[in-house]
């Protein structure tokens, strides 16, 4: 088995999908989890205005709507959380995503004050954060807020990780990578677009250039610029297609060096890092 085949198998990626079937699969997955643990009353997700959180948010609300109708339990809710750092450049996209999702509840937590306070405390301890590390601080503060909300609403934190993101480890460890449940896991980027199109999402929300937008020095830096490879290339690779040799090397290098991000904390029983 080639490394490409191993990666595809590990991430559960498929060369082709039926959008309606995958929508149903994700909704049923979320419903099944909540039914298994009836003490859970909410799904909590940060909404950025990008493709992934828009899709995950819509699926969450659909799952909650169905579960309420089936059980008569009106305490179930989907909580969409806006988490800007100061003023967000693409705020209108966030509002458009909220309008599309129609969440039960919308909370806004501006993380800038918390991030600056943490940065100042570290500075006083003799640690000056780089712009890159400050970006990770933002991602972790966003997740911290979501877990606080989930803790107060008997909820679970929903993630947006998918195969095209997992393969490169393009997420912050214990930031956006630290969630309870991931309904998009297995899909690549173009497949996520297919689901949103099937759901009637406004095109500009999934045709915009994806960006983590964490760095102050490089605002709205496109993911593809940071990765050095396009999502089309990544999706082709995940679909088992032949890609240029350098593209394959770039993708595989990202995969191998970020393996620790896709695993629980390393113990004495692990040896993947020795290979």
Curated annotation (Swiss-Prot):
Chain residues that bind deamido-NAD(+): 140, 173, 180, 260-261
Biological processes, Gene Ontology terms: NAD biosynthetic process
Annotated GO MF terms: ATP binding; glutaminase activity; metal ion binding; NAD+ synthase (glutamine-hydrolyzing) activity; NAD+ synthase activity
EC class of the enzyme, as a word: ligase
SUPFAM superfamilies cross-referenced by the UniProt entry: Adenine nucleotide alpha hydrolases-like (SSF52402)
Native source species: Escherichia fergusonii (strain ATCC 35469 / DSM 13698 / CCUG 18766 / IAM 14443 / JCM 21226 / LMG 7866 / NBRC 102419 / NCTC 12128 / CDC 0568-73)
Official protein name in the record: NH(3)-dependent NAD(+) synthetase
Signal peptide (residue range): none
EC number annotated for this UniProt entry: 6.3.1.5
Catalytic reactions of this protein: deamido-NAD(+) + NH4(+) + ATP = AMP + diphosphate + NAD(+) + H(+)
UniProt keyword terms in alphabetical order: ATP-binding, Ligase, Magnesium, Metal-binding, NAD, Nucleotide-binding
Recorded family membership: Belongs to the NAD synthetase family.
